[in-house]
From Swiss-Prot:
Alphabetical UniProt keywords: Cell membrane, Cell wall biogenesis/degradation, Cellulose biosynthesis, Coiled coil, Glycosyltransferase, Manganese, Membrane, Metal-binding, Transferase, Transmembrane, Transmembrane helix, Zinc, Zinc-finger
Gene name tied to this protein: CESA3
Protein name: Probable cellulose synthase A catalytic subunit 3 [UDP-forming]
Similarity annotation: Belongs to the glycosyltransferase 2 family. Plant cellulose synthase subfamily.
Cofactor: Mn(2+); Zn(2+)
InterPro entries: Cellulose_synth, CES_Znf_RING, Nucleotide-diphossugar_trans, Znf_RING, Znf_RING/FYVE/PHD
Catalytic residue positions: 399, 793
Organism from which the protein derives: Oryza sativa subsp. japonica (Rice)
TM region(s), chain numbering: 281-301, 304-324, 870-890, 903-923, 940-960, 989-1009, 1021-1041, 1051-1071
Coiled coil: 453-480
Amino acid sequence: MEASAGLVAGSHNRNELVVIRRDGDPGPKPLRQQNGQVCQICGDDVGLNPDGEPFVACNECAFPVCRDCYEYERREGTQNCPQCKTRFKRLRGCARVPGDEEEDGVDDLENEFNWRDRNDSQYVAESMLHAHMSYGRGGVDVNGVPQPFQPNPNVPLLTDGQMVDDIPPEQHALVPSFMGGGGKRIHPLPYADPNLPVQPRSMDPSKDLAAYGYGSVAWKERMESWKQKQERLHQMRNDGGGKDWDGDGDDGDLPLMDEARQPLSRKVPIPSSQINPYRMVIIIRLVVLGFFFHYRVMHPVPDAFALWLISVICEIWFAMSWILDQFPKWFPIERETYLDRLTLRFDKEGQTSQLAPIDFFVSTVDPLKEPPLVTANTVLSILAVDYPVDKVSCYVSDDGAAMLTFEALSETSEFAKKWVPFCKKYSIEPRAPEWYFQQKIDYLKDKVAPYFVRERRAMKREYEEFKVRINALVAKAQKVPEEGWTMQDGTPWPGNNVRDHPGMIQVFLGQSGGHDIEGNELPRLVYVSREKRPGYNHHKKAGAMNALVRVSAVLTNAPYMLNLDCDHYINNSKAIKEAMCFMMDPLVGKKVCYVQFPQRFDGIDRHDRYANRNVVFFDINMKGLDGIQGPIYVGTGCVFRRQALYGYDAPKTKKPPSRTCNCWPKWCICCCCFGDRKSKKKTTKPKTEKKKRSFFKRAENQSPAYALGEIEEGAPGAENEKAGIVNQQKLEKKFGQSSVFVASTLLENGGTLKSASPASLLKEAIHVISCGYEDKTDWGKEIGWIYGSVTEDILTGFKMHCHGWRSIYCIPKLPAFKGSAPLNLSDRLHQVLRWALGSVEIFFSNHCPLWYGYGGGLKCLERFSYINSIVYPFTSIPLLAYCTLPAICLLTGKFITPELTNVASLWFMSLFICIFATGILEMRWSGVGIDDWWRNEQFWVIGGVSSHLFALFQGLLKVIAGIDTSFTVTSKGGDDEEFSELYTFKWTTLLIPPTTLLLLNFIGVVAGVSNAINNGYESWGPLFGKLFFAFWVIVHLYPFLKGLVGRQNRTPTIVIVWSILLASIFSLLWVRIDPFLAKNDGPLLEECGLDCN
């Protein structure tokens, strides 16, 4: 879509549409079309048969397949044509394979039975050997990890190719062609020693030399390039450069197209010296826990039975919570990407880029809490991303229908015409101007050109003027006119009533409008505000994201999408290419539903006392999940596959037979594998859905493996097959009453309908964002962002994993995205409250991981992780009780354990050692610092006794009484002094429980010490255990305490009054029940013999 001349607003229900943009949308650029003489599997030339005619593998449909792929498919694959599924017949000159029909004629016994002499001159030595032998040349193991290629003496060498015209006739050699199709051939090549010379092959004098490629200028140039690379490779081997043979090298002079065929990413397992001790300690800790609980249960405390029982229940709950959190971290991995290989394969210089298009989603609600300048920086970083501009579209969702956001976006589009060419010209990072100009670095380093200095200063002045204009709009928006806002042409702003307004779309930038100052094209920038009417449930952020999915499908329909919060800018301009290394990888990409990046933050104090960075979760838990089925979706910084969001199952892959012993029962093997795969229930599906694709079938260019198993694209007669499997009525019931959108869902590789005009597309876009479009459809249930929780991200990722998809965790060296985090504790607790409330809502919903999704594609340990993510708020009750126990013990003089024996002390000490050892080894393999680990432990207690507790009760009220709770948007970025709000405490009831706990434990410590002084030295021994227990609570609440008394007594008086009152009442109650005064031990009257009468 091109840039629009005006705002398009309308309501499908009211049959209204205003300001239609002009026609002339050229549409997305099509990918390079391949002719019929190119192999549709590997991309090489089809070549000729021994008679000099074009090689035809399948006599039924003449599907273009080269001889090498034909022989490999017959030998290693399904032996069927990829298009018509007809079994390949043996052709003259090919070896016989099991299953071939008996033939009467004897034409070539040598080829038929593969009788050949390896020293025969008809063979060619395979010489193109790449240093990274571990990838791209071998098979694939059960987990999809490429294995090193092993030479097979029964596999003949390649025998087709082209002759080289600069070699004497008596030394003509046949060299396999590696350059066709962009280097996408993936079938294994036979092993040969590169030190051997190229074996000559005689030419048939009866054939024309052109049949062998003789005299080809292109081949001559490629041969010269190949010779040079072979010389470098031979020299590297002679110089002891064999270090690269294990795949660890990074030599750019290795054979080019070998590099282009290599995987785009690889797994990097944690070294065994780091992960194995960690696993051993976990097992030891489980054993120690068993003995510990045996002692605790078998040794109650008679005089403090209630305290003992409460403590044991809390400890058992903590142990179960630890198991749910620990075992998903059993298989942590890291990943590497190869951007150079991605460039070689899909983005060659001087050629049309074949990288997949991507749609960016930015969501915002309230411009007063989410400053427009912050949103503008996010949009600018997207428009300047290092990606082909015709492949990028940015959609900004304004769920508040604010004219301020609309005008700020208009100003941003104008400034982008200057900012984007500056970023790409000098390759600056980051490409958000606010953060680029705030960098405290020497910007002259490696930038010695005087014109860069001048242009940087000029651009900084331009940005300062841009900020002035944005701030002026913000100041103007503070005073709302009584009659409402009006646009520049005097038209009333359609969104004056936030709860009742039509849908609005404005295209600011595009292909035919809004070029930058250098005349280059800019990415599309589209403003979207969905329709809102009273009486409709709009589902907050999840509903806004689903509206963006639909409107983007109508206008651009990119196969991939990336969603960002308005305060998360792109810090690494190559982040999208990092994600494409997984999404577009021919080996693993088809089953990847999304690529999640970690969240990194700016503006956090060095000590991070409120654990805003969440390093433990992003650098430990998420790495562990990546080794199972992938990380959970965290709401931002995630690249999605559009088809996965449409609720389709992941493509089924045919795994090679395992090399395990068949003498064990199947159920025993499953138990040993942690139950990753359960026996699948029999379903009555069409045969076309039951057919599994071979490794070669999934590598095709012409017909990519469709995630649904429902639609096959690109093959003749596919339209008839679609009509037989999926009818239009069912699709409209699933996706909604929009024929244009339904048609877009059938295009796995994206793209819009060329027959539709821009005006009709805009009208359809208004229709799909209407408030009633989702009624009686699967939106929010099976499609898109899932409804039912304020944490829609967890539900959405969970549904995709249940469909068998896997996700990828990508951690580039330069953080991909950065955002802002709440500075003060009150905002941080409200943020955690919202997350915990969403988990409670999921727990009481139909999508609870405890009972949903069995028999699907969700793995066992992945389910553990999801269960942990929704039950953790319930830990707040035992945590609150356990943190209260030290004060009770000190006030009453009792304790939760009896007097410890030597054996009991051994179990207690062993448990403490295992706890510390687990943390230390976890930090060792993950690289997390002890400060971050300890801050995470502290905030686990602070959030547990405040936000998680309130979320639990609010969730119960919502489920039982139907009382809905609303959340407020966390404030993003401000102009205040750095860290000025660090100690600011805003009034919130969340502050009362931790303050009360602090006062209770301080009172308990004072009371315990006073009691010990009154009763003498003997009482000091038991006191140490109680004091340690109390100090454990106080130390975990220390960041809260420091903020409470940190600066200028900013703590609200009402918080202090309520906390003191509750602590005093609680303490006096226990004193009244069981005072800690010394009891009278005088003689009994019956024993003293005195008659008092």
